[in-house]
UniProtKB/Swiss-Prot annotation:
One of its GO terms (molecular function) is peptidoglycan binding. It is found in: Membrane. Residues 106-122, 128-155 have a biased composition (Basic and acidic residues). The chain crosses the membrane at residues 53-70. This is Uncharacterized protein aq_1894. One of its GO terms (cellular component) is membrane. PROSITE patterns: SPOR.
Amino acid sequence: MVIMLIFASSTGTILPSKKAKSMEKDFSIFQGNKLNLKYKRQREEVMQKKHRLIFLATVLAGLILFYFGVDTWMKQKQVQQNQPPPIVIKPVAPVKPKTQESNQTTKKEVKQEEQKKEEPKKMVQKQETQEKREVKKSEKNEVKQTQEKKDVKVAKKVPKTEKKAANLRTYKFQVGAFRYRENAYKMAKIVRSKGFDAQVVKVGSLYRVYAYVKAKNYWEAKREIKKHFKDAIFVRK
């Protein structure tokens, strides 16, 4: 038996039992590692699922919040659009009573009528003052020209035969035009006092005063009339 054991040990027949044990250990280790790997994989899968669930939950929460936020914003916008625009109240000017307006219009009409009535009066007054000035001028000329009157009187004393020989002609001059008859006749009286024949003729709305001058020619007649009436105008027959 001892020899067989020695032979078995020398040949290695006992080795298979050790290998089996070592193989069992290795197998058990391999299985343990395999189980660990499975467990790790399961844990990783669980963690991945958790992460996915968390991500999905956050996305859903964000979508829900976004939806409700947009919904509330849209509602507020619709409410603002549906609200009527603010009414602007403008200040209203105080309405004046009609009585004041009517009084003002009547006053204006009365003033206009008074102005219309006063205008012809003013025109008449201006014409009267102008006529009076002309009469005064003629009277002043009459006072200044007393010496010329004497010369005219001397000329009147010349014999008629000499005048006929000279073939004297009569020239017509206008010495004034007046609106009122009285002023015209006053002027005619002054013309006669100067030694000239005078005539008052109404032409239109004016009374014209004409003086007739006897002289040899036009220039002599003009010289004679201009001595007394500087504004005299020659009138052709």
